Amino acid sequence: ITARLTKGLEAAIPDLEQRVDHILTKQVFGIGITDLTAKLARRSLYCSKWANGPHSIAKSFETEAGNVWFERTEHIWVGGTERVLTADADGHQIKKFTNGKCLYCGAGQKALDRGDALESHAYAFIHTDDITALIADLFGEDMQFDVIIGNPPYQLSDGGGSGTSASPIYQKFVEQAKKLEPRLLTM
């Protein structure tokens, strides 16, 4: 996409550096599904882990993230059946239900409710009731996407045991992307 935009905007923005900066700051946006995928996308797009770094080919960004967003998202657990007593961060005893499923993706709580040290695999793109509002919140304005390209995961473990049980989630990414009404959607 960026190569086609670079060639297509040559007459409108003759200076290559200005054209690339315009494309990367105004026309290309991304949402990482994990911290690692966001960093990989930034390296691919900006030639730098940081969009505003000295090696970035985009020179107008003020933030390290640029237009590739990632923020840890948590699952919303529902339907837990077992209650355990545990403590919160301040040491106060609390009751916690286990063996639930995520409201948005169906992932098993037993497999993925494992604290802040490990990846949650709760993807913001599908963990929302209003994807349009989320996109506006992330990128600061109402956005209209002509093209959406994605490579979402196909499934998540649902805690069913020994890797043979999984919740399909690919279709949830497709459904959310369709709500953004792009002219072209490819996953």
What does each model-identified segment do?
Residues 1-187:
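SAM-dependent methyltransferase catalytic region
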